[in-house]
């Protein structure tokens, strides 16, 4: 009897312990889930090409400056291409190209949504992937256009904002405006005129190619041929410039690495560029070299045989973007170099843990490391606990490889750092022994000023006309709240933006799903190479972190037959996809779903699209008539040209100023 009672007590205690552990884990998981809602996006846009006069205005600011290549762009940022000018912006594999006299605003740019305000001008968008949870919307003064499939699209907005032309070379998009909705499919060009009270549209053939189209197609061909897509994901923003400026090779101990082809004596990563303050990440590196985006926001750097090699992380669908993968030297409060008040930094080496200096969750710290380097998951957890949970301001118990590389540490004055001045032209001479013994910090205790946000761009008078700046657009989705100026954010933080509680402790990280690292075709049709295993430690191998991937993108079959030049042409199968008000024929794999409108801070330049109403019989008759006219004029066979049907109509010239 006593033995039976003893066993029953043991079972009860064990059950209680299990329930307590389970409850604690659940609470910790909920805490981490809540904390993730405050994580910054894992991607940004990059200004990677400009021709002519390109002006940029950071979110929340009033000043327009020259567009600086490699400047990261986020929600709220504005870009203007003046007369006879062009610009190209990349978000992963998606290319956004601006024509002459074109102004855009990134209303929302986060992990799942790209929402662009197009107030005037011409915009060409090449979308290579659309995941199930991705949303891509372009808002103009009279319509909202949602891209439903990978493809190539062009939107033209007249100077007075009363007319929007939507052209679909391949793909499928959905138009909402004036209380009606339409689909625009491959091989169609639809023109929408009027406002939300009365919106009319015409349907026609895709116009002949103009100079902007030809330029965009040439840029696409360059990306299609990129050999770097064999070694990194196309969703790594900036991959397309690596072929032209460097070479891939195998490096023992690191695997396949990339090395810049021509650099000057004394070159080191994160030296030839400047720092800017980009919210919500804070201090962000902007490299001068035309190839200087991917190698400074993804992966790690290794010094091998007297040269620097960039070591990308495991090939994942979308690696997490970082503002700068460095560790800071002497950036803590109260520390001065013997040469004066300054800030130093060096690139992280493969396998070293990056600890963000901005507010993030434990899951974010895991993902930003395991998608950018091959690292032991236990090591990430240990560093996280030491630096964040225990709130250590310095990192003294970790040996950093590149801190001891001759010439690997860059130090500049406080004034040069905060005012976005070129680092290479403002170097401080610091003794190597002082650099090695200086404390390592994850963040810099340097308060930004307006120049930190504006960056290295010079003030310009070239900017959009006042009517374009203030012109509202029609939107289906609620945009991100407007960004406050740096002065407003500092005032809200009590005057010291960098002294806020950056990270609050959360529960254990969720285990990331295992991912096969074997070379295999991915959704782009290029190979994925796993990283070499450099450790002989069995425990290291068992604990090696697996990248936490986004859901595998659904594969959409492109409409049409590949042409001689490799671009899909509109297919005859699309002929009967008539744009029908309120009841459009939906794509096979994805349908337009109106978003749930949630209360949000209103945006002064966005008007919600009116609810879609049932078309009248007269409207349906007009829709059928327009479709039949378009259908009769369409070629009987797929065109042999690159992207537009034969016998196409000339593109209408926009009126000059």
Question: Model-derived features: where do they sit?
Answer:
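Short, intrinsically disordered, low-complexity terminal/loop segments
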Residues: 2, 30, 655-657
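Bacterial N-terminal signal peptides
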Residues: 11-21
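Bacterial N-terminal signal peptides that target proteins for export
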Residues: 2-13
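Sec/Tat signal peptide C-region and signal peptidase I cleavage site
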Residues: 22-28
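Solvent-exposed, flexible loop/coil residues
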Residues: 5, 68-71, 77, 108-110, ...
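Low-complexity, repeat-rich tail regions
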Residues: 191-657
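Flexible, surface-exposed loop/linker segments and immediately adjacent secondary-structure boundaries
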Residues: 28-181, 185-189, 225, 347
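Extended, hydrophobic interaction surfaces within ordered domains
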Residues: 23, 165-214
């Amino acid at each position: 009897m006593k033995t039976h009672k003893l066993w029953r007590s043991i079972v009860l205690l064990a059950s209680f312990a299990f329930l307590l552990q389970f409850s604690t884990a659940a609470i910790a998981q909920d805490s981490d889930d809540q904390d993730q809602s405050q994580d910054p996006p894992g991607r940004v846009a990059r200004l990677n090409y400009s021709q002519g006069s390109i002006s940029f205005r950071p979110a929340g600011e009033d000043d327009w400056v020259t567009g600086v290549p490699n400047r990261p762009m986020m929600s709220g940022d504005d870009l203007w291409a003046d007369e006879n000018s062009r610009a190209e912006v990349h978000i992963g594999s998606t290319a956004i190209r601006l024509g002459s006299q074109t102004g855009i605003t990134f209303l929302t740019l986060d992990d799942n949504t790209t929402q662009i305000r197009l107030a005037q001008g011409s915009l060409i968008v090449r979308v290579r992937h659309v995941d199930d949870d991705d949303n891509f919307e372009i808002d103009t003064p009279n319509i909202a256009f949602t891209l439903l499939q990978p493809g190539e699209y062009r939107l033209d907005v007249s100077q007075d904002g009363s007319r929007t032309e939507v052209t679909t070379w391949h793909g499928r998009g959905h138009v909402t405006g004036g209380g009606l909705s339409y689909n625009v499919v491959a091989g169609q060009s639809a023109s929408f005129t009027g406002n939300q009270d009365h919106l009319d549209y015409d349907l026609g053939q895709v116009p002949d190619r103009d100079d902007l189209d030809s330029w965009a197609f040439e840029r696409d061909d360059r990306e299609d041929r990129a050999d770097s897509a064999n070694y990194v994901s196309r969703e790594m923003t900036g991959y397309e410039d690596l072929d032209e400026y460097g070479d891939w090779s195998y490096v023992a101990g690191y695997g396949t690495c990339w090395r810049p082809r021509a650099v000057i004596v004394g070159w080191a990563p994160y030296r030839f560029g400047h720092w800017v303050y980009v919210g919500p990440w804070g201090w962000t590196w902007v490299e001068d070299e035309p190839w200087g985006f991917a190698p400074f926001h993804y992966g790690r750097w290794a010094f091998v045989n007297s040269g620097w090699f960039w070591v990308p992380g495991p090939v994942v669908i979308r690696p997490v973007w970082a503002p700068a993968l460095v560790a800071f030297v002497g950036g803590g409060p109260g520390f001065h170099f013997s040469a004066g008040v300054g800030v130093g930094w060096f690139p992280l080496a493969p396998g070293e843990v990056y600890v963000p200096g901005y507010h993030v969750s434990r899951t974010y710290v895991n993902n930003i490391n395991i998608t950018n380097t091959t690292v032991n998951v236990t090591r990430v957890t240990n560093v996280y606990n030491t630096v964040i949970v225990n709130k250590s301001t310095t990192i003294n118990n970790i040996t950093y490889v590149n801190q001891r590389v001759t010439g690997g540490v860059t130090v500049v004055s406080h004034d040069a750092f905060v005012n976005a001045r070129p680092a290479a032209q403002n170097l401080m001479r610091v003794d190597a022994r002082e650099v090695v013994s200086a404390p390592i910090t994850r963040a810099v205790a340097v308060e930004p000023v307006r120049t930190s946000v504006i960056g290295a761009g010079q003030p310009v008078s070239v900017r959009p006309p006042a009517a374009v700046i203030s012109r509202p657009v029609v939107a289906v989705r609620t945009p991100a709240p407007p960004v406050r100026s740096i002065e407003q954010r500092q005032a809200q933080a009590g005057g010291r933006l960098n002294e806020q509680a950056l990270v609050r402790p959360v529960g254990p990280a969720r285990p990331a799903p295992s991912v096969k690292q074997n070379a295999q075709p991915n959704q782009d049709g290029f190979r994925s190479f796993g990283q070499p295993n450099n450790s002989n430690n069995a425990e290291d191998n068992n604990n090696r972190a697996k990248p936490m991937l986004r859901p595998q993108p659904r594969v959409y079959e492109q409409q049409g037959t590949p042409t001689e030049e490799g671009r899909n042409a509109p297919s005859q199968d699309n002929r009967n996809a008539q744009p029908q008000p309120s009841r459009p024929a939906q794509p096979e794999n994805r349908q337009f779903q109106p978003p749930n409108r949630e209360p949000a801070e209103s945006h002064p330049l966005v008007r919600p699209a009116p609810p879609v109403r049932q078309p009248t019989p007269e409207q349906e008759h007009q829709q059928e008539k327009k479709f039949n006219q378009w259908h009769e004029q369409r070629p009987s066979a797929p065109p042999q040209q690159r992207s537009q049907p034969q016998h196409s109509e000339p593109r209408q010239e926009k009126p000059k100023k």
